[in-house]
């Protein structure tokens, strides 16, 4: 599994990564999805969640998920299209499902 540290510049920049901690159901689902389904190693849960919630802020502001993912892909060094799409999808599905159409 490729180790990846993703610095995102969506709103307030954050990093994708996983450390031990307690997460709520939606948060745990988000962390599991980006780790298991999209192969991201998570070193810091708080930063990974901050990135997910930054995605949700963009979605709530009316930006389409594809646009949010494109911005991550284009702005973050070593971000793959699959990772960007996966982070945006996982955040929408698990952290802010009310933004799905």
For each feature predicted by the language model, list its residue ranges.
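Amphipathic alpha-helical segments that form the core helices of the histone-fold
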Residues: 48-61
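Compact alpha-helical subdomains of small soluble proteins
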Residues: 63-101
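Alpha-helix C-capping/helix-to-loop hinge sites
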Residues: 37, 41, 55-58, 75-76
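Cleaved targeting-peptide boundary
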Residues: 25-34
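N-terminal alpha-helical segment
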Residues: 27, 48-51, 68
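Classic N-terminal secretory signal peptides
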Residues: 1-25
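Short, surface-exposed acidic
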Residues: 39-48, 79-84
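Acidic/histidine-rich, surface-exposed loop or edge segments in extracytoplasmic proteins
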Residues: 33-36, 68
């Amino acid at each position: 599994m490729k180790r990846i540290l993703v610095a995102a510049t969506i709103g307030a920049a954050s990093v994708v990564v996983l450390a031990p901690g307690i997460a709520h159901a939606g948060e745990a689902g988000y962390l599991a999805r980006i780790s298991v389904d999209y192969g991201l190693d998570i070193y810091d849960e708080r930063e990974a969640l901050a990135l997910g919630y930054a995605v949700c802020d963009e979605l709530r502001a009316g930006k389409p998920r594809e646009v949010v993912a494109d911005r991550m892909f284009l702005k973050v060094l070593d971000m793959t299209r699959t990772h960007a799409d996966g982070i945006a999808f996982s955040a929408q599905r698990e952290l802010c499902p009310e933004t799905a159409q």
